[in-house]
Amino acid sequence: GFPDKFSGLPAARTIKAEVKCNKLDPSTFNKRKQATGMSLDTKNTFVLPADLFFDIDFIIDRFNYKTFSADNVTGSVNYKPRVFDVKSLNLNSLDGNISGNCLIAQNNDKSFVGQGAFKLDKIDIRKTFTSFNNFGQKFIKAENLDGSLSGSLSLLLPFDSLMHPVIKGITAEGKYVISRGALIEFDPVKELSSFIKLSELKTIHFEELENDFFIRNNYLYIPQMEVKSTAANLSVSGKHDFNNNYEYHVKIQLSELLSKKLRKPRPNTTEFGAVQDDGLGRTSLLLKIINKGKEAKVSYDVKAVGNQIKNDIKTERQTLRKILNEEYGLYPADSVEKKKPDKENPRFRVIWEE
């Protein structure tokens, strides 16, 4: 492209290189602009160049950006007009390892969309939420979580023209295993204090928790989960949005209510409460926990609408997988609709410490 450039004709610039860096901190670029008196107008739309192509392999010993840091960052980045494509990304961060592929593309309206598929190996959950500012939501924060996280994540995240993430537009699906974990002072769990002693619910420790999850339309969907702990044996399902509105459906075996750790239900529970017999002589109490606005409430799940939540989850899951497959080919075609859920086993497996 250089001869055309010298002649004054439009020409694409092509770069191929290997880059090695001891330390990289993108925030220092802005500091240098401020030191030289250059204007930093953050309201200007960010536009990717239309006449640039490059392939760069990179090795970065230390990467820092705001509250996030990583070591031994390696990978390759390819750029063609309006598309950054990062492949074979590998880095050590958050006390573990992260690897995967991702891309960022600019739309015709100057907005952006990011897409990625990542694998996580033994990263610290609390440090992750702290580094990413709780991912822009308030319903579960760093102080509510503890443990080591491994798993996989497929993600679509839109950005506006200023490269600000649009959290409400996030679409994601993944599988994870949390080891040596804890759920601490989590409000929906604390609402069960009418039935379980509050001291048992403040911090719930578990040895291992395995599950899949997905996020769409501003909701985190939680399929049925069997929880066995020293606090109680529960079955939980529900959904939780990023504005901290939630609806959970909880099933507690009535035999648990006779133990010393659980409070007895209000009088006339069997007459007015919602109970269920599993056919084996084990009767369960059905509860519903709802929070809309600032007020949370626990009630008997008389209509057992947990079944409707379960159906909603199945529908949203199929829709999500279609989106990820049709737009980015993240899943094989036969895995989107043909695969039937296992009706015998819950999607969650929780192994609790004795």
Per-segment meaning from a language model:
Residues M38-S39, L94-I104, G306-T319:
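Short, surface-exposed polybasic-and-hydrophobic patches located at secondary-structure transitions
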Residues G1, P10-Q34, P49-N64, T74-N78, ...:
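Small-residue helix/turn framework positions
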Residues K31-V47, I351:
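Intrinsically disordered, low-complexity segments enriched in small/polar residues
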Residues E295-E354:
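Gram-negative outer-membrane assembly/targeting C-terminal domains
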Residues P3-K5, K16-E18, A304-D312:
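Surface-exposed edge beta-strands and adjoining flexible/disordered loops or tails in beta-rich
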